[in-house]
Structure formats: C-alpha cells, structure tokens
C-alpha cells in the first residue's frame, strides 16, 4: 500500500434535496462485492522491517455488521437546514469573485471526536478506511466522506464515486475493473535513472533542506493560517484566458494555455502580491498532475496516489515584473516537459530511492523557496455526482437553483493544507452547475483580508466596465 501519505481526506457535499441513506449504503455494500473493489474495506496493519514501520492491507474474508467494509452513520433533523448552526453556513455561489468561508468551521459535519485522523489511528484498530456521515434535513442533505489519503487521491476518488454511482443507477456493467493486489506503480522505478530528472539540479541537499525548513518555520511562527473557499465566476476565467492568449499572440511564440494554467498563474501572482516575500527569493510552484494516462494506461483502474508535481521555479521579482502570460506559459511548459514517461520514471526513481534510504522523500526547489502547491480535482467530477435514484424529496425547487435533482450544490475539503508542509496550498474542487470554479486555499488570516479587498476591487471594476452585475 502507499505508505507515504499520512493525511486524512475529508470531503463535505451539500445537496438541496432529501437523499435516502439506505439506498446509498446498499449500493456501496454491493460495490464492495464486485471483483477487487472489496479491497476498499481492507484494514491497515503495521509491518516492521529494516526500513522501519510500513503498512499493509488485511482484507476480511467477509464483511459483516460487526466487521463492516465501511462506516455509514446517520443523523436526522426534522427542521430545515437553515436552522442548523453549522450546516446553514455551508457556502453558496455569489455573483462575483467571492471568499465563501473557512472550511475548518464545517469539520464537525464529518469526523467526530475519537474517529481516526492519521494512518496510525487506522493501523492499530480494526476500523475500515471509508467513513461516511449522512445528515438529513427536511429540505436538504449533507454527506461527509472521510478516508486516509493513502487509499485514494483526488482522481482515484472520482473513479470510486463513478463506480458507486453506476451501481446506484443499476448499471453494474459500467463498474470498471479495479487493479489487483500488486502495486501498479512498482515498475515506474525501472525506467530512466534519477539523474535524468529535468530538475535534478534543484534537489535540495540536507543542509539546504534544513534552511528550507527554517524559512517555513519562520513564515508560520507569528501568523495563523486558514483554509477558505474562493469562488471564481466562469466569465472571469474566460476573460483571463482571452487576455493571456492575446498577450501570447502578440509575442509570436507559443500560444496554447489551459484554463488551469491561467487560473494558477493568476492566483500565484495574487498571493505573491499580498504575502510580500522578498523578491530575491524563488517561487517554487508545484502543479500536481495525474500520471495514469501516461504511465498506467494499460492497467485496470487504479485509485491509489498517482499524481506528481510539475515544478516551475522562477525568481519572484521576474514573476511580478512580467505579464501574467509569462507565468501561465511557464506553467504550461513545465507540465509538458515533466509529464513525459521518462520524467515520471526518473521522478519515481528519485523519490523511492530516498524513501528506502532515509524514510523521507527528497525536497525539490530552492532553500529560500516560496513554495505553492496546487491540485485540480475537476476531472473527479465531484459537482456532477448524481444521487437522484436516492433522492426521496426535492428540497429547493428546480426553478430556484442551477443544480439538477440529486446533484451537489456545495463541495468542500476540510483537510487542512498545512499538512502538506508548504507556504501556500490550494486545489480546484471543480466547477459547479453554472461553470463557476470552486477553489480552496490556505493563507494567513491577514492575507485573506487583503485578498478580499483585491476581489472587491476586481468586482467593482468588472461591474463598471460591463454596466451590469459581475
């Protein structure tokens, strides 16, 4: 099993309909009876060897009420969701760029005191890895999903959800074959040597790693950090990309950049402007990408961690001096160059060798690096999760909302990004029914105040320019 990730992933989804928990429980139980999907109910067990404590899976011969394949808890309220002190504050899309709320405020809707929060909490108990908390109101439903990050990454979670939904809709023939008990990534260390990694010169030595850790310690010493959701209208992202493409066209160079490239470049420059790091430092921008289509395409479905970062390393002064198209294109080039099969092999060789020798992965960047990490979960289709077969009653009338029956109107990740050990972490949770981008970031509280001022200014400028709402 993947023994690197100790984080617990916690996702919370709000539905503006009444969703029956029993239908979800039955369909999930059925999924765990199909082929290798029964692995999802495995227990984590420690296994000691010369390299220290590692972990492995033990799969019960049969799942029973006393030894289930997953935990599915329920809470039911006779009132509407608007009367609940926590669930009533779950964010909704606003008309313009907006900061929607602190995700930690909603953690109580998922894991409860005493529930596992780290891999070791699972390893020394007999608990299954999948936890669900289903809260039903008379007009809405909140579902919290929790699992150790070693079980699934964002894209793997999307594969799991699509398989579950296929069973819920009675389409078991659409459930993909899940990989067996061998690690599909094991061959990735057999290709190019670590020295072929394009950023090999940016691998930090132990002294540089200590300096890097000191920078991180200093940055977090006097200021608390907070995760919040920033919702970005579809039209704003389209305008950003159009402006970037115009700038690139005028330069007579490469012209393709994706929405993700542009969104990441805009956020990185904005965060640099409000955080104010020394301009002679380096920006280390880590854009996580899915390796399945390149390195695991011949394998059955693989849900464990299969993402690595495409790193862009640039002087901060240059990032802020050049137009946004410069950083967007650098992000695109880094992704194209580093997602090749030889680079994936070299990266895995580097990291696995380090883990085997020291128990820790190597740090890539600069000793004074201002590090940001970003992951785009849009292809996990969290906002397109169709639970309509389990919807027993419509909550909010369809004419008053943009979502279809049984689709989520809010998606949050309550996992604190501080676990990632970087200065600023973020992810794209996906696009809602109107095409608006839901992103989530970890910043200092003072920086959130500055970002709110910037977004208000942008909204005012766009409203003035268009002569209508943003």
UniProtKB/Swiss-Prot annotation:
GO terms for molecular function: acyltransferase activity. Its EC number is 2.3.1.-. Keywords: Acyltransferase, Transferase. Pathway: Secondary metabolite biosynthesis. Disruption phenotype: Blocks the production of protubonine B and leads to the accumulation of protubonine D. It is an enzyme of class 2 (transferase). The active site is at residues 149, 386. O-acetyltransferase; part of the gene cluster that mediates the biosynthesis of protubonine B, a hydroxylated and diacetylated cyclo-L-Trp-L-Leu derivative. Within the pathway, pboC catalyzes the acetylation of protubonine D at the hydroxy group to produce protubonine C. The first step of the protubonine B synthesis is performed by the nonribosomal peptide synthetase pboA that catalyzes the formation of cyclo-L-Trp-L-Leu by condensing L-Leu with L-Trp. Monomer. Belongs to the plant acyltransferase family. This is O-acyltransferase pboC. The lineage of its organism: Eukaryota, Fungi, Dikarya, Ascomycota, Pezizomycotina.
